[in-house]
Amino acid sequence: MDHLPIFCQLRQRDCLLVGGGDVAERKARLLLDAGANVTVNALDFTPQFQVWADSQMLTLVQGEFIPSLLDNCWLAIAATDDETVNQQVSEAAEARRIFCNVVDAPRQASFIMPSIIDRSPLMVAVSSGGTSPVLARLLREKLESILPLHLGQLARYAGHLRARVKQQFATVGERRRFWEKLFVNDRLAQSLANDDRQAVADTTEQLLTEPLEHRGEVVLVGAGPGDAGLLTLKGLQQIQQADVVVYDRLVSDDIMNLVRRDADRVFVGKRSGYHCVPQEEINQILLREAQKGRRVVRLKGGDPFIFGRGGEELETLCEAGIPFSVVPGITAASGCSAYSGIPLTHRDFAQGVRLVTGHLKTGGELDWANLAVEKQTLVFYMGLNQAPAIREKLIAHGMAEDMPAAIVENGTAVTQKVVSGTLGQLDILAQQMASPALIIVGRVVGLRDKLNWFSNH
Protein backbone atom coordinates (compact mmCIF):
# COMPACT_ATOMS: atom_id res chain seq x y z
CA MET A 1 0.00 0.00 0.00
CA ASP A 2 1.67 3.20 -1.19
CA HIS A 3 -0.75 5.57 0.55
CA LEU A 4 -2.78 5.42 3.75
CA PRO A 5 -6.41 6.39 3.05
CA ILE A 6 -7.60 8.90 5.65
CA PHE A 7 -10.48 11.36 5.99
CA CYS A 8 -9.40 14.74 7.38
CA GLN A 9 -11.47 16.87 9.75
CA LEU A 10 -10.77 20.38 8.43
CA ARG A 11 -13.74 22.28 9.81
CA GLN A 12 -12.59 25.71 11.06
CA ARG A 13 -8.96 24.80 10.35
CA ASP A 14 -6.65 26.97 8.26
CA CYS A 15 -5.71 25.68 4.81
CA LEU A 16 -3.68 27.32 2.05
CA LEU A 17 -4.48 26.99 -1.64
CA VAL A 18 -1.88 28.36 -4.05
CA GLY A 19 -3.34 29.02 -7.49
CA GLY A 20 -6.23 31.04 -8.86
CA GLY A 21 -7.25 29.23 -12.04
CA ASP A 22 -9.96 26.71 -12.92
CA VAL A 23 -8.13 23.76 -11.33
CA ALA A 24 -7.58 25.70 -8.12
CA GLU A 25 -11.26 26.67 -8.16
CA ARG A 26 -12.25 22.99 -8.10
CA LYS A 27 -9.93 22.36 -5.15
CA ALA A 28 -11.36 25.39 -3.34
CA ARG A 29 -14.88 23.99 -3.64
CA LEU A 30 -13.76 20.80 -1.89
CA LEU A 31 -12.06 22.69 0.93
CA LEU A 32 -15.09 24.93 1.39
CA ASP A 33 -17.42 21.92 1.40
CA ALA A 34 -15.26 20.45 4.18
CA GLY A 35 -15.70 23.63 6.24
CA ALA A 36 -12.07 24.75 6.14
CA ASN A 37 -10.84 28.32 6.63
CA VAL A 38 -9.35 28.82 3.18
CA THR A 39 -6.69 31.30 2.13
CA VAL A 40 -5.99 31.50 -1.60
CA ASN A 41 -2.72 32.91 -2.93
CA ALA A 42 -2.23 33.71 -6.62
CA LEU A 43 -1.26 36.43 -9.05
CA ASP A 44 -4.74 36.35 -10.65
CA PHE A 45 -8.07 34.79 -9.73
CA THR A 46 -11.09 33.51 -11.64
CA PRO A 47 -14.31 35.50 -11.10
CA GLN A 48 -15.65 32.76 -8.83
CA PHE A 49 -12.87 33.37 -6.32
CA GLN A 50 -13.90 37.01 -6.11
CA VAL A 51 -17.52 35.96 -5.53
CA TRP A 52 -16.42 33.74 -2.65
CA ALA A 53 -14.23 36.49 -1.20
CA ASP A 54 -17.04 39.06 -1.41
CA SER A 55 -19.23 36.59 0.49
CA GLN A 56 -16.46 36.19 3.09
CA MET A 57 -16.24 32.48 2.37
CA LEU A 58 -12.47 32.64 1.89
CA THR A 59 -9.53 35.05 1.91
CA LEU A 60 -7.59 36.15 -1.18
CA VAL A 61 -3.91 37.06 -1.03
CA GLN A 62 -2.79 38.43 -4.39
CA GLY A 63 0.92 38.23 -5.21
CA GLU A 64 3.88 35.87 -5.28
CA PHE A 65 3.92 32.85 -2.99
CA ILE A 66 5.84 33.36 0.25
CA PRO A 67 6.48 30.47 2.69
CA SER A 68 5.13 32.41 5.68
CA LEU A 69 1.62 31.95 4.25
CA LEU A 70 1.88 28.37 5.50
CA ASP A 71 2.31 29.40 9.13
CA ASN A 72 -0.44 27.88 11.30
CA CYS A 73 -1.87 25.90 8.34
CA TRP A 74 -2.99 22.31 8.67
CA LEU A 75 -2.94 21.50 4.98
CA ALA A 76 -1.82 23.01 1.67
CA ILE A 77 -2.59 22.52 -2.01
CA ALA A 78 -0.40 23.74 -4.87
CA ALA A 79 -2.55 24.16 -7.98
CA THR A 80 -0.75 26.61 -10.24
CA ASP A 81 0.39 26.03 -13.82
CA ASP A 82 3.97 26.91 -12.79
CA GLU A 83 5.99 23.84 -11.78
CA THR A 84 8.58 25.98 -10.01
CA VAL A 85 5.98 27.62 -7.78
CA ASN A 86 4.37 24.27 -7.04
CA GLN A 87 7.77 22.89 -6.04
CA GLN A 88 8.36 25.86 -3.74
CA VAL A 89 5.03 25.30 -2.01
CA SER A 90 5.77 21.59 -1.60
CA GLU A 91 9.22 22.17 -0.11
CA ALA A 92 8.01 24.89 2.25
CA ALA A 93 5.17 22.67 3.47
CA GLU A 94 7.52 19.71 3.93
CA ALA A 95 9.85 21.84 6.05
CA ARG A 96 6.91 22.71 8.32
CA ARG A 97 5.57 19.13 8.38
CA ILE A 98 2.36 20.23 6.70
CA PHE A 99 0.65 17.83 4.33
CA CYS A 100 0.71 19.22 0.79
CA ASN A 101 -0.99 18.13 -2.41
CA VAL A 102 0.58 19.12 -5.72
CA VAL A 103 -1.85 18.90 -8.63
CA ASP A 104 -0.69 16.54 -11.40
CA ALA A 105 2.60 15.86 -9.60
CA PRO A 106 2.00 13.08 -7.07
CA ARG A 107 5.72 12.48 -6.50
CA GLN A 108 6.10 16.01 -5.15
CA ALA A 109 3.06 15.67 -2.90
CA SER A 110 2.82 14.32 0.64
CA PHE A 111 -0.83 13.44 0.04
CA ILE A 112 -3.01 12.84 -3.01
CA MET A 113 -6.69 13.63 -3.50
CA PRO A 114 -8.94 10.77 -4.57
CA SER A 115 -11.99 10.72 -6.79
CA ILE A 116 -14.97 11.17 -4.48
CA ILE A 117 -18.49 9.80 -4.38
CA ASP A 118 -20.34 12.14 -2.06
CA ARG A 119 -23.39 10.78 -0.29
CA SER A 120 -22.72 12.83 2.83
CA PRO A 121 -22.31 11.76 5.53
CA LEU A 122 -21.37 8.63 3.59
CA MET A 123 -18.23 9.23 1.54
CA VAL A 124 -16.44 6.87 -0.84
CA ALA A 125 -12.96 7.66 -2.14
CA VAL A 126 -11.23 6.00 -5.11
CA SER A 127 -7.56 6.44 -5.92
CA SER A 128 -4.97 4.90 -8.22
CA GLY A 129 -2.16 6.44 -6.22
CA GLY A 130 -1.68 9.04 -8.91
CA THR A 131 -0.68 6.45 -11.52
CA SER A 132 -3.92 6.52 -13.51
CA PRO A 133 -6.36 9.33 -12.64
CA VAL A 134 -8.56 8.48 -15.64
CA LEU A 135 -9.03 4.91 -14.37
CA ALA A 136 -9.94 6.22 -10.92
CA ARG A 137 -12.47 8.57 -12.52
CA LEU A 138 -14.06 5.73 -14.51
CA LEU A 139 -14.34 3.61 -11.36
CA ARG A 140 -15.91 6.55 -9.56
CA GLU A 141 -18.48 6.89 -12.34
CA LYS A 142 -19.36 3.20 -12.04
CA LEU A 143 -19.79 3.51 -8.29
CA GLU A 144 -21.89 6.66 -8.75
CA SER A 145 -24.28 4.62 -10.89
CA ILE A 146 -24.54 1.85 -8.29
CA LEU A 147 -24.94 3.85 -5.08
CA PRO A 148 -28.46 5.30 -4.67
CA LEU A 149 -28.69 9.07 -4.36
CA HIS A 150 -30.73 8.74 -1.16
CA LEU A 151 -27.92 7.00 0.76
CA GLY A 152 -26.86 10.23 2.42
CA GLN A 153 -30.35 10.87 3.75
CA LEU A 154 -30.54 7.29 4.97
CA ALA A 155 -27.17 7.54 6.73
CA ARG A 156 -28.15 10.80 8.46
CA TYR A 157 -31.46 9.32 9.55
CA ALA A 158 -29.70 6.25 10.92
CA GLY A 159 -27.52 8.56 13.00
CA HIS A 160 -30.62 10.09 14.60
CA LEU A 161 -31.95 6.62 15.43
CA ARG A 162 -28.82 5.19 17.06
CA ALA A 163 -29.73 6.04 20.64
CA ARG A 164 -33.23 4.61 20.32
CA VAL A 165 -31.99 1.45 18.61
CA LYS A 166 -29.43 0.91 21.36
CA GLN A 167 -32.19 1.28 23.94
CA GLN A 168 -34.62 -0.98 22.04
CA PHE A 169 -32.28 -3.90 21.33
CA ALA A 170 -30.11 -5.38 24.05
CA THR A 171 -27.48 -7.24 22.02
CA VAL A 172 -25.09 -6.29 19.24
CA GLY A 173 -26.54 -9.07 17.08
CA GLU A 174 -30.07 -7.73 17.42
CA ARG A 175 -28.95 -4.24 16.57
CA ARG A 176 -27.06 -5.47 13.51
CA ARG A 177 -30.13 -7.33 12.22
CA PHE A 178 -32.24 -4.21 12.71
CA TRP A 179 -29.82 -2.02 10.74
CA GLU A 180 -29.69 -4.59 7.95
CA LYS A 181 -33.48 -4.44 7.69
CA LEU A 182 -33.54 -0.66 7.74
CA PHE A 183 -30.89 -0.11 5.08
CA VAL A 184 -32.60 -2.34 2.50
CA ASN A 185 -36.12 -1.05 3.14
CA ASP A 186 -37.23 0.57 -0.12
CA ARG A 187 -40.32 2.17 1.42
CA LEU A 188 -38.26 4.01 4.03
CA ALA A 189 -35.73 5.17 1.43
CA GLN A 190 -38.48 6.47 -0.85
CA SER A 191 -40.25 8.23 2.03
CA LEU A 192 -37.01 9.98 2.99
CA ALA A 193 -36.42 11.01 -0.62
CA ASN A 194 -39.97 12.45 -0.78
CA ASP A 195 -39.62 14.14 2.63
CA ASP A 196 -42.76 12.30 3.74
CA ARG A 197 -42.21 12.52 7.49
CA GLN A 198 -45.33 10.63 8.47
CA ALA A 199 -44.43 7.70 6.22
CA VAL A 200 -40.88 7.75 7.58
CA ALA A 201 -42.18 7.64 11.15
CA ASP A 202 -44.69 4.87 10.40
CA THR A 203 -42.14 2.70 8.59
CA THR A 204 -39.55 3.20 11.32
CA GLU A 205 -42.04 2.26 14.01
CA GLN A 206 -42.93 -0.89 12.10
CA LEU A 207 -39.27 -1.85 11.72
CA LEU A 208 -38.60 -1.25 15.41
CA THR A 209 -41.54 -3.28 16.66
CA GLU A 210 -41.84 -6.20 14.21
CA PRO A 211 -39.95 -9.46 14.88
CA LEU A 212 -36.29 -9.31 13.92
CA GLU A 213 -36.57 -12.41 11.76
CA HIS A 214 -36.16 -11.03 8.26
CA ARG A 215 -39.44 -10.71 6.43
CA GLY A 216 -39.21 -12.04 2.92
CA GLU A 217 -40.12 -9.99 -0.12
CA VAL A 218 -40.11 -10.25 -3.90
CA VAL A 219 -38.95 -7.61 -6.38
CA LEU A 220 -39.89 -7.95 -10.05
CA VAL A 221 -37.04 -6.45 -12.05
CA GLY A 222 -37.08 -5.76 -15.78
CA ALA A 223 -33.66 -6.63 -17.19
CA GLY A 224 -34.24 -4.83 -20.48
CA PRO A 225 -33.91 -6.31 -23.96
CA GLY A 226 -30.35 -7.69 -23.75
CA ASP A 227 -27.61 -5.06 -23.64
CA ALA A 228 -26.45 -4.92 -20.01
CA GLY A 229 -26.01 -1.17 -20.36
CA LEU A 230 -29.79 -0.84 -20.67
CA LEU A 231 -30.43 -2.28 -17.20
CA THR A 232 -31.77 0.52 -14.99
CA LEU A 233 -29.79 1.79 -11.99
CA LYS A 234 -32.53 0.64 -9.63
CA GLY A 235 -32.57 -2.76 -11.29
CA LEU A 236 -28.81 -3.05 -10.77
CA GLN A 237 -29.16 -2.10 -7.11
CA GLN A 238 -31.85 -4.74 -6.59
CA ILE A 239 -29.93 -7.65 -8.13
CA GLN A 240 -26.92 -6.74 -6.00
CA GLN A 241 -29.02 -6.93 -2.82
CA ALA A 242 -30.81 -10.19 -3.66
CA ASP A 243 -30.55 -13.43 -1.68
CA VAL A 244 -31.96 -15.38 -4.62
CA VAL A 245 -32.48 -14.47 -8.28
CA VAL A 246 -35.10 -16.31 -10.34
CA TYR A 247 -34.39 -15.66 -14.02
CA ASP A 248 -35.29 -16.82 -17.52
CA ARG A 249 -33.43 -17.25 -20.80
CA LEU A 250 -34.12 -13.70 -21.99
CA VAL A 251 -31.76 -12.36 -19.32
CA SER A 252 -28.28 -12.02 -20.82
CA ASP A 253 -25.13 -13.51 -19.29
CA ASP A 254 -23.68 -10.00 -19.01
CA ILE A 255 -26.54 -9.00 -16.73
CA MET A 256 -26.29 -12.19 -14.68
CA ASN A 257 -22.61 -11.38 -14.12
CA LEU A 258 -23.77 -8.28 -12.25
CA VAL A 259 -25.80 -10.30 -9.73
CA ARG A 260 -24.50 -10.44 -6.16
CA ARG A 261 -21.90 -13.21 -6.12
CA ASP A 262 -23.27 -15.19 -3.18
CA ALA A 263 -26.91 -15.02 -4.30
CA ASP A 264 -28.64 -18.27 -5.24
CA ARG A 265 -29.64 -18.44 -8.91
CA VAL A 266 -32.72 -20.31 -10.05
CA PHE A 267 -33.11 -20.73 -13.83
CA VAL A 268 -36.72 -21.13 -14.93
CA GLY A 269 -36.44 -20.55 -18.67
CA LYS A 270 -36.31 -22.82 -21.69
CA ARG A 271 -32.88 -23.53 -23.10
CA SER A 272 -31.06 -26.39 -24.76
CA GLY A 273 -31.01 -29.20 -22.21
CA TYR A 274 -33.67 -27.56 -20.02
CA HIS A 275 -37.44 -27.67 -20.07
CA CYS A 276 -39.46 -24.54 -19.48
CA VAL A 277 -40.70 -24.34 -15.89
CA PRO A 278 -44.52 -23.95 -15.81
CA GLN A 279 -45.77 -20.56 -14.67
CA GLU A 280 -47.58 -22.02 -11.67
CA GLU A 281 -44.35 -23.62 -10.50
CA ILE A 282 -42.49 -20.30 -10.90
CA ASN A 283 -45.15 -18.64 -8.76
CA GLN A 284 -44.59 -21.26 -6.07
CA ILE A 285 -40.81 -20.83 -6.19
CA LEU A 286 -41.19 -17.11 -5.54
CA LEU A 287 -43.65 -17.76 -2.74
CA ARG A 288 -41.53 -20.47 -1.12
CA GLU A 289 -38.30 -18.46 -1.15
CA ALA A 290 -39.98 -15.33 0.22
CA GLN A 291 -41.61 -17.34 3.01
CA LYS A 292 -38.11 -18.36 4.10
CA GLY A 293 -37.46 -14.69 4.82
CA ARG A 294 -35.32 -14.16 1.74
CA ARG A 295 -35.04 -11.15 -0.56
CA VAL A 296 -36.10 -12.56 -3.93
CA VAL A 297 -35.55 -10.88 -7.28
CA ARG A 298 -37.62 -12.16 -10.19
CA LEU A 299 -35.46 -11.05 -13.10
CA LYS A 300 -37.24 -10.88 -16.44
CA GLY A 301 -36.15 -9.85 -19.90
CA GLY A 302 -37.66 -6.56 -21.06
CA ASP A 303 -40.34 -5.14 -18.78
CA PRO A 304 -42.14 -7.44 -16.31
CA PHE A 305 -45.55 -5.91 -17.05
CA ILE A 306 -45.35 -6.13 -20.85
CA PHE A 307 -45.95 -9.77 -21.84
CA GLY A 308 -43.81 -10.80 -18.88
CA ARG A 309 -46.56 -12.39 -16.77
CA GLY A 310 -45.54 -10.10 -13.94
CA GLY A 311 -49.13 -9.45 -13.00
CA GLU A 312 -49.86 -13.17 -12.64
CA GLU A 313 -46.87 -13.67 -10.36
CA LEU A 314 -47.78 -10.72 -8.16
CA GLU A 315 -51.36 -11.95 -7.75
CA THR A 316 -50.00 -15.12 -6.15
CA LEU A 317 -47.79 -13.10 -3.79
CA CYS A 318 -50.61 -10.72 -2.95
CA GLU A 319 -52.92 -13.58 -1.99
CA ALA A 320 -50.20 -14.95 0.32
CA GLY A 321 -49.49 -11.58 1.92
CA ILE A 322 -45.91 -11.39 0.63
CA PRO A 323 -44.57 -7.82 0.19
CA PHE A 324 -43.52 -7.00 -3.36
CA SER A 325 -42.36 -4.16 -5.58
CA VAL A 326 -41.68 -3.67 -9.29
CA VAL A 327 -38.70 -2.15 -11.12
CA PRO A 328 -39.68 -1.43 -14.74
CA GLY A 329 -37.36 -2.29 -17.59
CA ILE A 330 -36.89 -1.18 -21.18
CA THR A 331 -39.30 -3.33 -23.14
CA ALA A 332 -38.12 -5.23 -26.22
CA ALA A 333 -40.22 -3.11 -28.59
CA SER A 334 -38.42 0.04 -27.53
CA GLY A 335 -34.91 -1.43 -27.33
CA CYS A 336 -35.01 -3.57 -30.48
CA SER A 337 -36.55 -0.86 -32.64
CA ALA A 338 -34.03 1.75 -31.46
CA TYR A 339 -31.06 -0.56 -32.08
CA SER A 340 -32.46 -1.43 -35.52
CA GLY A 341 -32.95 2.14 -36.70
CA ILE A 342 -36.75 1.80 -36.73
CA PRO A 343 -38.62 4.61 -34.93
CA LEU A 344 -41.89 3.24 -33.55
CA THR A 345 -43.67 6.54 -34.19
CA HIS A 346 -43.13 9.17 -36.87
CA ARG A 347 -45.29 12.13 -37.83
CA ASP A 348 -45.37 11.05 -41.47
CA PHE A 349 -45.89 7.31 -41.01
CA ALA A 350 -47.21 6.23 -37.60
CA GLN A 351 -49.31 8.04 -35.01
CA GLY A 352 -49.62 5.02 -32.77
CA VAL A 353 -47.97 1.76 -31.67
CA ARG A 354 -49.63 -1.57 -30.93
CA LEU A 355 -47.74 -4.11 -28.82
CA VAL A 356 -49.17 -7.53 -29.60
CA THR A 357 -48.40 -10.97 -28.22
CA GLY A 358 -48.01 -13.93 -30.53
CA HIS A 359 -49.43 -16.13 -27.77
CA LEU A 360 -52.93 -15.94 -26.36
CA LYS A 361 -54.59 -18.01 -23.70
CA THR A 362 -56.77 -20.79 -25.09
CA GLY A 363 -59.69 -19.38 -27.05
CA GLY A 364 -58.19 -15.90 -27.44
CA GLU A 365 -58.23 -14.10 -30.79
CA LEU A 366 -56.71 -10.83 -31.91
CA ASP A 367 -58.76 -7.97 -33.35
CA TRP A 368 -57.14 -8.23 -36.78
CA ALA A 369 -59.36 -5.59 -38.37
CA ASN A 370 -58.06 -2.94 -35.97
CA LEU A 371 -54.50 -4.17 -36.34
CA ALA A 372 -54.59 -3.88 -40.13
CA VAL A 373 -55.29 -0.14 -40.27
CA GLU A 374 -52.77 2.39 -41.65
CA LYS A 375 -50.68 4.97 -39.76
CA GLN A 376 -49.63 2.71 -36.92
CA THR A 377 -46.75 0.38 -36.07
CA LEU A 378 -47.34 -3.21 -34.99
CA VAL A 379 -44.84 -5.01 -32.78
CA PHE A 380 -45.39 -8.74 -32.27
CA TYR A 381 -43.75 -10.36 -29.25
CA MET A 382 -43.11 -14.13 -29.36
CA GLY A 383 -44.55 -14.23 -32.85
CA LEU A 384 -41.80 -15.90 -34.88
CA ASN A 385 -43.56 -19.27 -35.16
CA GLN A 386 -46.82 -17.48 -35.98
CA ALA A 387 -45.30 -15.38 -38.80
CA PRO A 388 -47.27 -17.18 -41.57
CA ALA A 389 -50.53 -16.70 -39.67
CA ILE A 390 -49.73 -13.04 -38.92
CA ARG A 391 -49.05 -12.43 -42.62
CA GLU A 392 -52.24 -14.19 -43.67
CA LYS A 393 -54.51 -12.47 -41.12
CA LEU A 394 -53.24 -8.94 -41.74
CA ILE A 395 -53.50 -9.24 -45.53
CA ALA A 396 -56.95 -10.82 -45.23
CA HIS A 397 -58.11 -7.82 -43.19
CA GLY A 398 -56.89 -5.27 -45.70
CA MET A 399 -53.23 -4.53 -44.99
CA ALA A 400 -51.14 -4.12 -48.16
CA GLU A 401 -48.75 -6.93 -49.02
CA ASP A 402 -46.00 -4.37 -49.67
CA MET A 403 -46.22 -2.98 -46.11
CA PRO A 404 -42.62 -2.86 -44.78
CA ALA A 405 -41.81 -5.48 -42.15
CA ALA A 406 -38.74 -6.50 -40.17
CA ILE A 407 -37.71 -9.22 -37.75
CA VAL A 408 -35.13 -8.52 -35.02
CA GLU A 409 -33.28 -11.44 -33.43
CA ASN A 410 -31.31 -11.00 -30.17
CA GLY A 411 -32.14 -7.31 -30.19
CA THR A 412 -29.62 -4.86 -28.62
CA ALA A 413 -27.02 -7.62 -28.16
CA VAL A 414 -23.76 -7.78 -30.09
CA THR A 415 -25.27 -10.79 -31.88
CA GLN A 416 -28.30 -8.78 -33.05
CA LYS A 417 -29.55 -9.79 -36.48
CA VAL A 418 -32.18 -7.92 -38.50
CA VAL A 419 -33.91 -8.91 -41.73
CA SER A 420 -36.41 -6.67 -43.49
CA GLY A 421 -38.75 -6.87 -46.43
CA THR A 422 -42.51 -6.70 -46.85
CA LEU A 423 -45.50 -8.18 -45.09
CA GLY A 424 -46.00 -10.50 -48.05
CA GLN A 425 -42.51 -11.94 -47.41
CA LEU A 426 -42.92 -12.28 -43.64
CA ASP A 427 -43.09 -16.08 -43.59
CA ILE A 428 -39.93 -16.30 -45.72
CA LEU A 429 -38.12 -13.78 -43.49
CA ALA A 430 -39.07 -15.79 -40.41
CA GLN A 431 -37.35 -18.88 -41.78
CA GLN A 432 -34.02 -17.02 -41.57
CA MET A 433 -34.39 -16.16 -37.88
CA ALA A 434 -34.39 -17.83 -34.46
CA SER A 435 -35.90 -16.92 -31.10
CA PRO A 436 -35.87 -14.63 -29.27
CA ALA A 437 -37.16 -12.43 -32.07
CA LEU A 438 -39.51 -9.51 -32.50
CA ILE A 439 -41.64 -8.72 -35.57
CA ILE A 440 -42.20 -5.08 -36.55
CA VAL A 441 -44.75 -4.15 -39.23
CA GLY A 442 -45.39 -0.62 -40.49
CA ARG A 443 -44.22 2.18 -42.78
CA VAL A 444 -41.56 3.19 -40.22
CA VAL A 445 -39.60 0.04 -41.12
CA GLY A 446 -38.78 1.76 -44.40
CA LEU A 447 -36.58 4.23 -42.48
CA ARG A 448 -34.22 1.48 -41.37
CA ASP A 449 -31.74 1.86 -44.22
CA LYS A 450 -31.32 5.54 -43.37
CA LEU A 451 -31.37 5.34 -39.56
CA ASN A 452 -29.58 2.04 -38.93
CA TRP A 453 -26.77 3.08 -36.57
CA PHE A 454 -26.06 0.00 -34.47
CA SER A 455 -24.80 -2.38 -37.16
CA ASN A 456 -22.53 0.41 -38.44
CA HIS A 457 -20.69 0.57 -35.11
Curated annotation (Swiss-Prot):
Database matches in Pfam families: CysG_dimeriser, NAD_binding_7, Sirohm_synth_M, TP_methylase
Residues annotated to bind S-adenosyl-L-methionine: P225, G301, G302, D303, I306, T331, A332, M382, G411
Region (Uroporphyrinogen-III C-methyltransferase): 216-457
Positions of the catalytic residues: D248, K270
UniProtKB keywords: Cobalamin biosynthesis, Lyase, Methyltransferase, Multifunctional enzyme, NAD, Oxidoreductase, Phosphoprotein, Porphyrin biosynthesis, S-adenosyl-L-methionine, Transferase
Keyword Isomerase: no
GO molecular function: NAD binding; precorrin-2 dehydrogenase activity; sirohydrochlorin ferrochelatase activity; uroporphyrin-III C-methyltransferase activity
Catalytic reactions of this protein: uroporphyrinogen III + 2 S-adenosyl-L-methionine = precorrin-2 + 2 S-adenosyl-L-homocysteine + H(+); precorrin-2 + NAD(+) = sirohydrochlorin + NADH + 2 H(+); siroheme + 2 H(+) = sirohydrochlorin + Fe(2+)
NCBIfam families: cobA_cysG_Cterm, cysG_Nterm, PRK06136.1, PRK10637.1
HAMAP family in UniProt: Siroheme_synth
Family: In the N-terminal section; belongs to the precorrin-2 dehydrogenase / sirohydrochlorin ferrochelatase family.
Protein's name according to its UniProt entry: Siroheme synthase 2
Organism: Klebsiella pneumoniae subsp. pneumoniae (strain ATCC 700721 / MGH 78578)
